[in-house]
Structures are given as C-alpha cells and as structure tokens.
Amino acid sequence: MAIVKCKPTSPGRRHVVKVVNADLHKGKPYAPLLEKNSKNGGRNNNGRITVRHIGGGHKHHYRLVDFKRTKDGIPAKVERLEYDPNRSANIALVLYADGERRYIIAPKGVNAGDQIQSGVDAAIKAGNTLPMRNIPVGSTVHCVELKPGKGAQLARSAGAYAQIIARDGAYVTIRLRSGEMRKVLSEGRATIGEVGNSEHMLRELGKAGASRWRGVRPTVRGVVMNPVDHPHGGGEGRTSGGRHPVSPWGVPTKGFKTRKNKRTDKYIVRRRTK
C-alpha cells in the first residue's frame, strides 16, 4: 500500500492524496453477492429531505458482507481483496471448503491465499472469528457483536479495532478507539486483529467534485441562510448568528450531550474521551 501525492497539473489535482493498494482485485466483483443499491437523495417516502447533504454520486451495487461469520469449523481460503464503494474498509472474498463464497471485512495482515476459520476451536490469529469468551484478555479484535447472533456492529470501518480488557461472568469489557469502555455479552463474536486499510484517513479528496462523486453535497452555514431556514439566519449584512451555535432544529451543537438511550447506560463503563 502506498500514499501517492499527485502532481499539481491542475487546480483540482494540486491537493489530491491517494491511497494505492496494488493487492486489490482489478476486475469485477463476485456477481452472486451483489444487490441493487438505489439512491433516494436523502428523501423519505413523502419526498422531504430527512438527511441533508446527500444526492448524486456514482452508481454502485451493494456487496453482501457476512457480518455473522457462522460457518463454524469449515476452513476458508481468501481468494482476493476488493474495493468496496459502500465503506471505508476493503473486503475479502473467501472460498469455504464446502464451495460457498462470502465477502468479509478484510483484516489487517490478511492477504490472498491465507486460511481463516470461525468457531470456538479457531486459532487466535488475524481473520479468525470466535466468541469473545474464547478470546484471551488483551487481544485486539474488530467486527464486534453487541447482541449474539445479530452480526458485527462495532469496529467495522478502516483501521478500527477494540481491545478486550476484562472478563466478568457473562460479560467482557472492551475499549474502543474513541476511548469508551463498555460491557458486551461474552457469547457475542468478534474477529481477531484490526480492520485493514488504515491509511484511508490519510487520503485527501482534493476538490469538491470528488465529494460529489461519492454522493456528498455541500454543507451551507446557517449564518448565510434566511431566518426561515435556520436559527442563525437573517440580519443586515454579515452577522455572528446572535446566539450560541445550534442545529437547524435548535439543538445546541457544541458540548451538548444528545445520547438518549438510558436503557443501555449501564453497559458503558466509561464515556468516550473528547
């Protein structure tokens, strides 16, 4: 994997920094694991914008990624690594001994030709998936299940990982990249190692059009809107907004805690660090 800074042959190329991975598959993805991925432009069934800054972008298919890893005891061979336009991490196409192929999140250090496995008897090595009760304390893991059998929900993006720091009865305590420490059920599964493509954070898109290719539209500041559109809007000439920063719906945007799920507060040992 290489970090490539483009030559300034045009204003749009001047600031581009690309991550080039020669190991990625250059052909088409595996067709049986593709699904239609239609766009809605951030609109709901009434045609109203429910998520701002979404629209346009290149067409692409959704890759069906196996987040459950339930084919226990069946060894699999990594056939190739692929780019996935739906996420920051790369994905790996694996071929199981029974002939089935599946996509998984590509772990760091796992390459084409490597063997992986899932189940309670799997070895402690990168790419193998086990229940967390069978993973040694101190291990680095990714694709962590919050509910056993639901599939991985934590530490799935490029370069992400969590560390198992304690085991207590039916729960294990994990530390996330954000600094948050939380309890999860030890029956839940996790994959050994960390997610690959950690250089993703070093890339620079270089121009607005590169964001538009990805379906991301511009973000307009509230102080340049009209009063009907934003609490900071209006005024004669340039203004400061006239109040503490808020969202378009009046919710404070700086330092205001918005977590509402009190039911799961008991599982958070330590809140994330700023």
Curated annotation (Swiss-Prot):
UniProt keyword Mitochondrion, yes or no: no
Gene3D superfamilies reported for this sequence: 2.30.30.30, Nucleic acid-binding proteins, Ribosomal protein L2, domain 3
Region (Disordered): 223-274
Bias kind Basic residues: ranges: 256-274
GO CC, alphabetical: large ribosomal subunit
Swiss-Prot/TrEMBL keywords: Ribonucleoprotein, Ribosomal protein, RNA-binding, rRNA-binding
Domain of life: Bacteria
Xref: InterPro entries: NA-bd_OB-fold, Rib_uL2_dom2, Ribosomal_uL2, Ribosomal_uL2_bac/org-type, Ribosomal_uL2_C, Ribosomal_uL2_CS, Ribosomal_uL2_dom3, Ribosomal_uL2_RNA-bd_dom
GO molecular function, one term: structural constituent of ribosome
Pfam families: Ribosomal_L2, Ribosomal_L2_C
SUPFAM superfamilies (UniProt xref): Nucleic acid-binding proteins, Translation proteins SH3-like domain
GO terms for biological process, alphabetical: cytoplasmic translation
HAMAP family: Ribosomal_uL2_B
The protein's assembly and partners: Part of the 50S ribosomal subunit. Forms a bridge to the 30S subunit in the 70S ribosome.
Sequence similarity: Belongs to the universal ribosomal protein uL2 family.
Role according to the record: One of the primary rRNA binding proteins. Required for association of the 30S and 50S subunits to form the 70S ribosome, for tRNA binding and peptide bond formation. It has been suggested to have peptidyltransferase activity; this is somewhat controversial. Makes several contacts with the 16S rRNA in the 70S ribosome.
Record's protein name: Large ribosomal subunit protein uL2
Organism listed in the record: Vibrio atlanticus (strain LGP32)
